UniProtKB/Swiss-Prot annotation:
Domain of life, per lineage: Bacteria
Pfam families: ATP-synt (PF00231)
Organism of this sequence: Pseudomonas fluorescens (strain ATCC BAA-477 / NRRL B-23932 / Pf-5)
Coiled-coil annotated residue ranges, if any: none
Principal subcellular localisation of the protein: membrane
Protein name from the UniProt record: ATP synthase gamma chain
Length: 286
């Protein structure tokens, strides 16, 4: 019965792991719902300011903010939003694949790259992969604040204003639904004209107190809001991916336990049969 004892030990070990993954699944469900609420609360502001900025990009105001002016691309910047923890399936891996693909296109054109990394997984990836990381922040927690991001974002905005980078993009996972998280690379600056149907009209603006003061503040708020929205959406995507990963792990553990239980029963049956055969054989010999 040595084999049977070993199988029983494996079953007990897998059941213990199954309890952990089941608990982690339940925790991820709770955290995902809270993350979805934060995402839904911040999305209207992010979308509205993006719409206003789109109008400004299509308009021709008397003051053209540097964020609205295209220039030759010699160096680009990426704000990469990753998770702090693992056990979330291929969420980070798929994100890094999309980023590396976009970086490869730029490098083929001789464009250099600067990186601002949000999340421990992104920092670990670029330590191994290589890259010019100029700013990094991690451990934002379950309820990230825009104030925690301002310092890192400012590094990239200053680099753009000083001409050290010519384009800034944000790389993150979009929360489509519980089952789908889509890695995206979106250009933040210079602003791209919004292709909405309503923006085909000509827009004129009156600025108070003046265009420069208003746009200087609005453009910074725009970038900060888009990065913050990327962070909260990535957090919701992370919890959804972790929930699915833990559910799959729990289900797989159940299947493995069933298979091992069947093997155990067969081993036990074989041992009993062997014992009976030995008893019968001994009785016959007598």
């Amino acid at each position: 019965m040595a084999g049977a004892k070993e199988i029983r030990s494996k079953i007990a070990s897998i059941k213990s792991t199954q309890k952990i993954t089941s608990a982690m699944e339940k925790v991820a469900v709770s955290k995902m719902r809270k993350a979805q609420m934060r995402m839904a609360a911040s999305r209207p502001y992010a979308e509205r300011i993006r719409q206003v900025i789109g109008h400004l990009a299509n308009a021709n105001p008397e003051y053209r903010h540097p964020f609205m002016i295209d220039r030759a691309i010699k160096r680009v910047g990426y704000v990469v939003v990753s998770s702090d923890r693992g056990l979330c399936g291929g969420l980070n891996t798929n994100l890094f694949k999309a980023l590396v693909k976009d970086m490869a296109v730029n490098r083929e054109q001789g464009v250099e790259i600067d990186l601002c990394v949000v999340g421990s997984k992104g920092a670990a990836f670029f330590r191994n992969f290589g890259g010019n990381v100029v700013a990094a922040i991690s451990h934002l927690g379950e309820e990230p604040s825009i104030n925690d991001l301002i310092g890192s974002v400012k590094v990239m905005l200053d680099a753009y204003l000083e001409g050290r980078i010519d384009r800034l993009s944000v790389v993150s996972n979009k929360f489509i639904n519980t089952m789908t998280q889509q890695p995206t690379v979106e250009q933040l600056i210079p602003l791209e004209a919004t292709p909405d149907q309503e923006l085909k009209h000509h827009w004129d603006y009156l600025y108070e107190p003046d265009a420069k003061e208003l746009l200087d503040g609005l453009m910074v708020r725009y970038v900060e809001s888009q990065v913050y929205q990327a962070v909260v959406e990535n957090n919701a995507a992370e919890q959804a991916a972790r929930m699915i990963a833990m559910k799959n792990a729990t289900d797989n553990a159940g299947d493995l336990i069933s298979d091992l239980q069947l093997i155990y029963n067969k081993a036990r049956q074989a041992a009993i049969t062997q014992e009976i055969s030995e008893i019968v054989g001994g009785a016959a010999a007598v």
